[in-house]
Structure formats: C-alpha cells, structure tokens
C-alpha cells in the first residue's frame, strides 16, 4: 500500500509541474517539395519557380500586334504572292506568325536561294518601309512590263504575278541590254529581291527575251553574281515547265546595287528599308490572334509570369522565363509541416521539434508553449522568426534574380540539304536544355535541403537558449520540453523566452523540490526491490510445493516408482 501511495505521489507531482516546450509552426498546407535526400516533403510554405500555364492566345507584344501571315509564308509575303495581298499594308509587327498550313510562298515554281538565311534576318526585323525601288512606269521604257504574268500566280481568276517584282520581257521583238542602279539613301539596310527565269526550251527563250545568249548580272560592294539561263526540259509544276529562281541581298546605307541584263531578269519593283527589333521573331502557331497584351509569347499561347522557369514551349519571343523540361520546381520558404496528433495529450504529441509542429502557433515560425498555474498558451519568438524570414526571402529573391534572365528563343533555319546540320544542332540544343534543366533542379534541391536544415538549426538554437538559462532548475523530458522544479508563473515564462531568466532566484526552491522528488523516487525504488525479492521467494516455494504434491500423487497410484537405496 505504501508503494502504491508513493507511485501516486510521483505521478501527482509530475502532473502539477509547470512545463515549457520549444516548437515550431504547423498548418494545413499540402505543399510538397523535393530535397537532395527526400521527395515530397510536406512544408508549411513554398514558392513555385516553374510556370506551366498560358492563355492559348497570340497577343500584342509591347503594345504592337503580331504579323499573322495566315495561309502565306515569309516567301509569299516578301515576294508579294497575289494570295497575300492582305499583307501589303502591314508595315510593323512585334513578331511574325506562320501557321501549319502557310503554303502560299513561291507561286511560280523554282528555288528561293538562301531562304533560311532570309528568314533568320527577318526574325529580327520589327518594321519596314516599303518603297518603289524602280518605278514601273519610268524605269524600263525599252522593255515590256505588263505581259509578265502567269497562270501559276492567279488573282481573281486571271493570270497575275508577284506584286513586288516585275517580269521584264522583250518589246517589239527587241530586248536591249539594260542597266539600272539604286543608291541606298534610307540610312538603314534595304532588302532587295529579284529573280532569274529559266525557260524550258530555246523557243520560249526567244519568244520571251529574243536573245539566245542572255545573262543577268547583279553587283554591289558586298554582292556580285552573274547568272545565265539554264534551258532544259522539266516536268510541269503548277502547269509550268519553266523555273524561276529567287535571290535577295541586304544593301548597306550608302551602297549602290546595279542590275545589268540582256534577258531573263525578274526585276525588283519594291524594296524594304528594315528596322531591327531585338524582341521580334518568327513562330509557327495555329493559335488565334486576340485583343490582349503580353510580355512573353510562345506558339502555344502568351505567358504572363515573373517566374524564372517555364515548361510550356522552348520557342519564346519577348521577356520570357527560361525553358526547362522539369515538371516541378518548388522552393521551400517555410518549415516541415508535421502537425501534432492532439489526441495524444498536450505535451505528449505536440512535443516541439521532436514529434511535430503546432497549429496553434500562428504568429511566428518558432516559439514556445507553456503550462502553469495561470493557464497555458503559445508565444512566438519574433526575433528568430523575423531573421529567418529575412534570410529566406533574400535567398529566394537572389535565386530568382540570378535565374530570371529573360530570353527570346527562336528556331534556327535550315534547308532540306542541311538536315545533318539541323539534326546536329538539335542534339546540341537538347544537350544545353538538359544541362539547364539539371542545373535548375539541382539548385532547387540543394536550396530546399539547406532551408529545412536552417529551420531545424533555429529550433535547436532556441532550445539550447532555454536549456542554458534553466540549467538544473528544470528537467529535460526528452521531447523538446522542460519540466520546472519550481513554480513558474507567466512572468517567469516570459523571462525564459526573452532571455532574462533569473536562475539564482529559483535555484533554492528547485533544489528542495528536486531533492524531495529524488527521495520519493529512491524510497519507491527500495519498496519495489523488496516486493520483487518477496515475489521471487514466494513463487519459488509455490513451485516446489506443487512439484512435491504431483510426485507424491504419482507414486501412490503407481505411475511413478520411487526407490530409496541405502
């Protein structure tokens, strides 16, 4: 009975002890992050670094609408294909959009020489001034300028021709040598386009140009070529057995370009003074053009985001996040989110940083929970919380600032003969993309690991701060909590929290209570030892008596024979 009373006394004393726990904030967040060592760690707060949404629209970029080519492509727009007349009035754009069915390019069959390079040049052009480089009515008085039409380039059901070129043919059975020059006085680069016709037969050559041995010569300070017609039978394309090759050059300011020909020249009528724009580009997209504005455009749609990474499309125009292959890039800013199981008791399961966080701690990341004669409650440690918030905020901002270099990324242009180069370029681009993706993911993993370790360290420092003040005036109960050996009212609790705890003031009371509790424990232990010895002896005697009784019974009924030899 005495032992039972002593045990109850110990339990009663422990229950009434004032207690202080160090712990951290928890909430109902379901955000998860990855670290170097763990995946899907639930945290209280995090920020997303990866944009994965767009609006599915083509929008104005910098307040300027895109040039939607519709069924036309760059070749058709630059040469003036009759099917592209709606584009003739457009002089500025933020970017150029081709669609998957932009097939109206060169209507008269032939090769567009260095077409991919022209596309590359135009991808950085945001506007142009279209002007008549050689006026139709006055530049070619000795040559016919109205007969150069073809059924391959129809308009309104009749034969027509490119709007920006003039197909010169003989006039009154004569094609005199022509020589025409233009001096670039626009103060900017001028795009000049022309063509050379290759008839299928000598009869067609004479019928169109009179001269059998015709040539075309084009020269400037940086361009000098001489062309001769290649007369040969060819299969018909778009009803034409002849071919027409198309050429272009960029004329620098102050430079002169001269055209000389005795036949077969498809002369330039209009040229383009170009204005470069760093954010321009050419994309292929079937998305519709809408009345909207954006800073970043992709073929799938516009992105309005300040995040450093996106996984929507590798081709972008404007101030765009860097494309990566990742599906998740989330950086932790809070703590591990492990809410305590309240049903296990106030100090059983919400035992600070060991077993879980506190949803009741709402005004800080780290703090205290106390229980004394005046009640119980939570109190955040504002200083350590603010220092942590400032440090993590600066780190996140630094990461975003370093990685948030805005990009315009457009596809490179290769013709069909450059497939090996194109494939090699794709492999190189894929390699760079893999490196970017790896760097981004590893950066986030490392920073997440460091942040969570940082929080653990802050909680531990808070615990050590309390332990160094309390010393032997309180007992560590192994779960982030201290059990006081003295009465600790709210003022006392506050002094522990703010670092002004008066150890000598409570040391004498703590010493007496500690000795009393230790004495009770010692006496209780002695009683337990006596009870244990008594129990052992008693159980041994019972066992011996039982064995003797069984043996006597077995001997009396003959089941067991006992012989005593002397």
Swiss-Prot record:
UniProt entry keywords in alphabetical sequence: Clathrin- and caveolin-independent endocytosis of virus by host, Clathrin-mediated endocytosis of virus by host, Disulfide bond, Fusion of virus membrane with host endosomal membrane, Fusion of virus membrane with host membrane, Glycoprotein, Hemagglutinin, Host cell membrane, Host membrane, Host-virus interaction, Lipoprotein, Membrane, Palmitate, Signal, Transmembrane, Transmembrane helix, Viral attachment to host cell, Viral envelope protein, Viral penetration into host cytoplasm, Virion, Virus endocytosis by host, Virus entry into host cell
Pfam families on file: Hemagglutinin (PF00509)
Site entry (Cleavage), positions: 344-345
Positions annotated as glycosylated: 27-28, 40, 104, 304, 498
Complex formation: Homotrimer of disulfide-linked HA1-HA2. Interacts with human CACNA1C.
Alphabetized GO MF terms: host cell surface receptor binding
Biological processes per GO annotation: clathrin-dependent endocytosis of virus by host cell; fusion of virus membrane with host endosome membrane; fusion of virus membrane with host plasma membrane; viral budding from plasma membrane; virion attachment to host cell
Cytoplasmic side, ranges: 551-566
Topological domains, Extracellular: 18-529
Main localisation: virion
Compartmental location: Virion membrane; Host apical cell membrane
Chain segments annotated as coiled-coil in the UniProt record: none
Organism, as annotated: Influenza A virus (strain A/Swine/Iowa/15/1930 H1N1)
Function summary: Binds to sialic acid-containing receptors on the cell surface, bringing about the attachment of the virus particle to the cell. This attachment induces virion internalization either through clathrin-dependent endocytosis or through clathrin- and caveolin-independent pathway. Plays a major role in the determination of host range restriction and virulence. Class I viral fusion protein. Responsible for penetration of the virus into the cell cytoplasm by mediating the fusion of the membrane of the endocytosed virus particle with the endosomal membrane.
Lipidation (S-palmitoyl cysteine): 555, 562, 565
Miscellaneous field: Major glycoprotein, comprises over 80% of the envelope proteins present in virus particle.
Membrane topology reported for the UniProt record: Single-pass type I membrane protein
Post-translational modification: Palmitoylated. In natural infection, inactive HA is matured into HA1 and HA2 outside the cell by one or more trypsin-like, arginine-specific endoprotease secreted by the bronchial epithelial cells. One identified protease that may be involved in this process is secreted in lungs by club cells.
GO CC annotation: host cell plasma membrane; membrane; viral envelope; virion membrane
Disulfide bond entries: 21-481, 59-292, 72-84, 107-153, 296-320, 488-492
Transmembrane segments: 530-550
Protein name (record): Hemagglutinin
